[in-house]
Amino acid sequence: MERTRALECFLSERQESEEKAIMKNLRLKEVSIKDLDQIRALYWRLLDSSPKYGQILQWKKNIYPNDDDWNSYIVKGEMYLILKDVDVIGAVAVTNAQSKEYGKIQWKVKADDQDVAVVHLLMVLPEYQGDGAATAALDEIIKLAADKKKKAVRLDAIETNVPAQKLYEKYGFVNCGTAQEYYESTGETEFVFYEYALAE
């Protein structure tokens, strides 16, 4: 029994050590229009890897996300690749203000639209999931927002995306409520809205 406990402790410590190593080597890189093909290929690679991603995320090729979505973020300097050393392992959009649908949520932090950063389309390739990469990406997003003097980081997760909800809550994001939204890819669907307060 003691040997089993010692082994479990060792494996847990080793996993934590490996996750910290990933966090140390992970960074965000802003992209340009010339990177659009690479961005698209990343998201399609995720969706093609398993039907579960389309079901959980409710993403549909060329409906959402599509080139117009990515371009709108890229031209405003809000689209990023997630890099581990030199390897591209994911992507994310971090906007410099919130959109109108966020105005109906009862947020904990009092802030104008331009005083918050909003996370969209966060994705990590399947082979890097489960090893701390998503948490490390959130670390970098929080740093990015803090450097821009934002008061909070906000995001939403579709109700079917339970893994993301667990990730955000474990990280420290506060559940600020739900709202029904209509999108072409999802229809009328409930979303959960989260907020992470930044120290002033």
Language model region names:
Residues 7-37, 199-200:
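Conserved N-terminal entry element of GNAT/NAT acetyltransferase domains
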Residues 47-69:
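Conserved GNAT-fold acetyl-CoA-binding loop/helix
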Residues 68-81, 97-101, 118:
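A short helix-loop-beta-strand connector motif used in the catalytic cores of GNAT acetyltransferases and
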Residues 78-92:
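Conserved beta-hairpin
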Residues 93-121, 129, 184-185:
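Conserved acyl-donor/pantetheine-binding loop and adjacent beta-alpha core of acyl/acetyltransferases
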Residues 120, 125, 158:
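Residue-level recognition of the GNAT/N-acetyltransferase active site
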Residues 124, 130-143, 166-170:
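Conserved acetyl-CoA-binding loop-helix of GNAT-fold acetyltransferases
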Residues 151, 158-162, 169-171, 180-200:
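C-terminal "cap" of GNAT-fold acetyltransferases
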